[in-house]
A protein has these predicted regions:
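Beta-lactam-recognizing serine transpeptidase/beta-lactamase-like catalytic domain environment
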Residues: 154-204, 209-446, 453
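Periplasmic/cell-envelope proteins involved in peptidoglycan metabolism and beta-lactam response
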Residues: 1-175, 199, 224, 280-287, ...
């Protein structure tokens, strides 16, 4: 009995020491963190979160500049609710307790200097972040923009947002009241919709993944003739699939092809392609893009989902245009476009540009790395041509920018009878040495009529692409 207790205690003290030390929910760690001047979180060298001295037992209080603009990124650091967002993910560095800061802390101990946390600079571009936030307006949704060549996230917006300053006031009761109010808010402002929360059906934006799978597996080419009926009954059911305009074919011909199907966002060809491919091949392609896999950027990203359980042919057909149990985050759809723009190679998304200690030593630089090759160069070239055509001559036309080649795909996802649609745009553009991929997700149909829904997400995407390219 004594031996068991000794071993357990030793495990906690030695093996789990780092984990406990870095856990922002650990009460002792929390109090120690407030004794130290916590490092700032920076965007383009300017603090968006920093500590200021206060005359309380906690010594310091966090201040969040432009709180609602960056809340989904910074999160909060409070004495009652712990920490979220980058405040949690980079807690060890911000509190001066990371392994890389050990000797700095040791030096402070001997010199009598006050220890201080490191500064964490994000990859976010403040101008693009602001323009993405403004472009979303009053709708519930999210925007993600990233550099396809490096994986660095340029903008990450989630709405509705909240002001984290209201969660760091000295009054415990005020903090609890505000936290409860946010938690019970039906619009779920505490969720970072860009990377998690309630994942959404991607709708027709998922056709990009299915088209890639069809090309990679040699099932078809861009101009391979495909059946073109005005309606399609899913195998083994009485359920009928229509193209966006009920009862109309995909183009004027007796047959259609992948180029036309993406141009007009036709559902029938993609339901048929999905059934021909089968779930395993679609899933394998989706997982190359990052579906069904954990990811830290260093914020924890909720894995997007292509179903792993057995499906019948009808269900597989529905996944062909992003329905049934396919669920995605905006970051995931930005990754899909980024891989195509980057010649088939997906770079790992990253939010941290650098970490700098209180004595100005760089503890960490940009972490640029490949996530993996998602498709062949040939497939990427074909997909690029198809998506450029979808914007220049198709339903994604609201993303057009004069003088710039823009590729992309819209999506209008169904959420059940009488439920408003989820709207999507994923795309990319480049000008000179500037490259950008973007994803836009708008919940509840954006609160607009069905005719306006077709262009809303693409219009937002176009504004964000322009914001990056015009700098």
């Amino acid at each position: 009995m004594f031996l068991s207790l000794f071993v357990a205690a030793t495990m906690v003290q030695v093996v789990q020491f780092d984990e406990l030390r870095e856990d922002p929910h650990n009460t002792r760690t929390l109090l120690q963190s407030y004794e130290t001047e916590r490092g700032p979180i920076l965007v383009n060298g300017e603090p968006i979160a920093y500590s200021t001295p206060v005359d309380t037992e906690y010594k310091y209080q966090r201040v969040y500049e432009h709180g609602e603009l960056y809340a989904n990124l910074t999160g909060y650091f409070t004495h009652t609710q712990g920490a979220t967002g980058m405040e949690s993910a980079m807690n060890a560095e911000l509190s001066g307790q990371s392994d890389a800061q050990f000797f700095e802390g040791l030096t402070a101990l001997f010199t009598g200097n006050k220890p201080a946390g490191a500064a964490v600079e994000l990859t976010i571009d403040p101008d693009v972040q602001q323009k993405a936030y403004d472009a979303l307006g009053d709708v519930q949704g999210s925007v993600v923009a990233m550099d396809p060549r490096t994986g660095q996230v340029i903008a990450m917006v989630s709405k509705p947002s909240y002001d984290p300053n209201e969660l760091v006031v000295p009054s415990t009761q005020e903090v609890l009241d505000k936290y409860t109010e946010l938690l019970e808010d039906d619009s779920q402002p505490l969720f970072n919709r860009a990377i998690g929360g309630n994942l959404q059906h991607p709708g027709s934006s998922f056709k990009v993944v299915v088209a890639t799978a069809a090309l990679e597996n040699g099932l078809i080419k861009a101009d391979t003739p495909l059946p073109n009926p005005p309606k399609y009954t899913l195998p083994g059911t009485s359920s009928v699939v229509y193209n966006p305009v009920h009862g109309q074919k995909c183009g004027d011909g007796e047959t259609t092809n992948l180029k036309i199907a993406l141009q007009y966002s036709c559902n029938i060809p993609f339901a048929d392609l999905a059934i021909q491919l089968g779930a395993d091949k679609i899933r394998a392609q989706a997982e190359k893009f990052g579906f069904n896999k954990p990811l830290e950027i260093p914020l924890d990203v909720t894995p997007s989902v292509y179903p792993t359980e057995a499906m019948d042919q009808a269900q597989v057909g529905l996944t062909g245009f992003g329905q049934f149990d396919v669920r995605v985050s905006p970051l995931q759809m930005a990754m899909v476009s980024a891989a195509i723009e980057n010649g088939g190679v997906l770079m790992k998304p990253q939010l941290v540009n650098q970490v700098v200690s209180a004595d100005l030593n760089q503890l960490q630089g940009p972490q640029v790395s490949e996530y993996g090759r998602v498709m062949s160069e040939e497939t990427a070239k074909t997909m690029n041509e198809l998506l450029l055509y979808s914007v220049s001559n198709g339903v994604a036309g609201s993303a057009r920018i004069d003088g710039i080649d823009v590729g992309g795909k819209t999506g209008t996802a169904e959420n059940g009878p009488d439920e408003p649609h989820t709207l999507w745009f994923t795309g990319y553009a480049a000008s000179g040495n500037t490259h950008v991929a973007v994803a836009v997700m708008v919940e509840k149909g954006g609160g607009v009529d069905s005719a306006s829904q077709d262009v809303l997400a693409a219009t937002i995407g176009q504004q964000v692409l322009k914001a990056v390219l015009e700098q």
